[in-house]
From Swiss-Prot:
Mode of membrane association: Multi-pass membrane protein
PANTHER family: PROTEIN ABCI12, CHLOROPLASTIC
Protein name, as recorded: Uncharacterized protein ycf92
Family according to the record: Belongs to the ycf92 family.
Gene Ontology cellular component annotations, sorted alphabetically: chloroplast membrane; plasma membrane
Species per Swiss-Prot/TrEMBL record: Porphyra purpurea (Red seaweed)
Amino acid sequence: MSKFELIPYRLYLSQSRTWMHKIKAEVKIYVLLLLWISFFILSYRKLLIVAFSLIITSSTIKCNQYIVKKHFAQTLVMGIAAIMFSFSITNSYQYNLKKEQYRSISSSLAQKTIQRYTPKQITHFNNQISEKLLFAIKPGSYFFITIYSIKLVMITTSSENLALSIYKTKIVNQIFNNELLFIFLLSSHIFNNIVVKMEKITQIISLRGSLNLLKHSTGIFTLFFLISKLFFSEIIKESTEISQSLYTRNLNQENDNFLKIYTSQIRTNDYICLFICTTYVTILFLS
């Protein structure tokens, strides 16, 4: 009975048998946590190396390449939009900073107190475009690594296996106490509220046309909002499918027979994946 596998909610996930599909869900969750921890210990350039590594990894998944390419294109567009938005905010910040410094110098000259005046400067950015681009790439790389790694895991693992892998851990059971299904049901409403709040922010910014920031970033903000709205609608759809999948199979802690169906032993490939991922991040950190 323990070897029996139910047909998951998405048939294309269960029908594929690539190397990434065969890795246990617990190992994939560990790799995700390892990637997210790397945000705090790796530099910009090393994060770009991690992003390219994810792209190379996705290219090795020979099955379902159409789905992989579709999600890669969506995530890449969102990452580029995040970089452009950050770069626009950086330019607007630098422009307003110089304008404020010029205004302070002019007022000081008018009051004849220029002898001891030292203009206030904030040295976050210089005039070099490369430094501003490097600063703008950071949020884009964060976004790409986070979202694309999650999508790769979701493509190669059924929603039920991921949910049950989290559900069977002792820490989650102690914290949530059989509320996992409620969390998945609630997540779709949370993302829906995010879309509504983004629409309100856009309306407020459009009404306040006198803002200096609006003159430099309205177009890119509108584009970023439209892409984000499309992206969050995809997440709402994913979350709804997960909640429906869990609900139709009557997930609860007392149903031991149901949990036994998904129990499986860790294999050699799982140990190899754990070793390679841990060594890879360690080498990037020490180099």
